[in-house]
């Protein structure tokens, strides 16, 4: 993989990871256009550059995400409540993460086989687009209430759909899950971003460990520049993508993303029917 190819893939990752459009489907198209061979390192690279995207969430939402100890005298100034609120978020994220961890571990081999099917990715991307055309009407009402522990768990169950249906988009599944629990679009999207941090961090570390077992520390030394550049680019692009998405979603809803998914999914299907070789 060249530096230029790494930059392009990182741009695709940063643009699509937090949007409900399936980063996997876009990676397939980008790799196919550039003629990137689907080696074990390339597959690991597409997962490991998620670390840069994770950092973008932590930077943008650092005041809401990070939890610091509160000095005793600060409790009287109301900061203790703020501390507990942030700590409460961690518990909700942990509860939401549990279903994916359990099911991902139990069905790891099956999930890997499904992820290796471009047809599955394309069809799910296409059908998910059709569904998104109706999301705004299906979940038009929201109580704009806070995310409770039961709601967090249900959103975690929705996240599992993205594990078993590659091409669905983790972002789409969790945001729709949040709206199904009557959260506002913005609240559902932001919790989806927060949940992405432990989910994607776990996937990144697991992939890095598997790559280490396969090629040892030398494989990281050999591709260190590519990995570094990829993560930096993914971080910068994801920052812009998240800011855009929150504003766009609040004003216009999901319909535009539905049409876009149909277009991309249809393109993948046409390419495969035309005999173009694509690999995950």
UniProtKB/Swiss-Prot annotation:
Catalyzes the dephosphorylation of undecaprenyl diphosphate (UPP). Confers resistance to bacitracin. Pfam families: BacA (PF02673). NCBIfam families: PRK00281.1-4, undec_PP_bacA. GO terms for biological process: cell wall organization; peptidoglycan biosynthetic process; regulation of cell shape; response to antibiotic. It catalyses: di-trans,octa-cis-undecaprenyl diphosphate + H2O = di-trans,octa-cis-undecaprenyl phosphate + phosphate + H(+). Its main location: membrane. It is found in: Cell inner membrane. Belongs to the UppP family. InterPro entries: UppP. The lineage of its organism: Bacteria, Pseudomonadati, Bacteroidota, Bacteroidia, Bacteroidales. The chain crosses the membrane at residues 1-21, 41-61, 87-107, 115-135, 147-167, 186-206, 225-245, 260-280. This is Undecaprenyl-diphosphatase. Keywords: Antibiotic resistance, Cell inner membrane, Cell membrane, Cell shape, Cell wall biogenesis/degradation, Hydrolase, Membrane, Peptidoglycan synthesis, Transmembrane, Transmembrane helix. It comes from Porphyromonas gingivalis (strain ATCC 33277 / DSM 20709 / CIP 103683 / JCM 12257 / NCTC 11834 / 2561).
């Amino acid at each position: 993989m060249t530096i230029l190819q790494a930059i392009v893939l990182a741009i695709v990752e940063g643009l699509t990871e937090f949007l409900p459009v399936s980063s996997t489907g876009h990676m397939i198209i980008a790799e196919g256009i550039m003629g990137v061979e689907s080696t074990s390192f390339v597959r690991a690279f597409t997962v490991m550059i998620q670390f840069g995207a994770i950092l973008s969430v932590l930077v943008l939402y650092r005041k809401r995400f990070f939890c610091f100890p509160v000095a005793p005298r600060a409790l009287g100034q109301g900061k203790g409540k703020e501390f507990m609120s942030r700590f409460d978020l961690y518990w909700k994220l942990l509860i939401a993460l549990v279903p994916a961890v359990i099911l991902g571990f139990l069905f790891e081999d099956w999930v890997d086989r499904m992820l290796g099917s471009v047809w599955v990715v394309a069809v799910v991307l296409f059908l998910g687009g059709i569904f998104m055309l109706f999301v705004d009407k299906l979940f038009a009402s929201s109580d704009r209430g806070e995310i409770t522990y039961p709601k967090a768990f249900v959103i975690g169950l929705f996240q599992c759909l993205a594990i078993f249906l590659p091409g669905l988009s983790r972002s789409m599944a969790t945001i729709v899950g949040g709206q199904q629990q009557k959260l506002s679009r913005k609240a559902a999207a932001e919790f989806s971003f927060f949940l992405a941090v432990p989910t994607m961090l776990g996937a990144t570390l697991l992939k890095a460990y598997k790559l280490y077992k396969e090629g040892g520390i030398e494989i990281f030394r050999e591709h260190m520049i590519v990995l570094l550049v990829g993560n930096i680019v993914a971080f910068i692009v994801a920052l812009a993508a998240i800011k855009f998405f929150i504003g766009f979603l609040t004003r216009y809803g999901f319909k535009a993303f539905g049409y876009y998914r149909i277009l991309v999914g249809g393109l993948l299907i046409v390419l495969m029917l035309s005999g173009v070789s694509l690999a995950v």
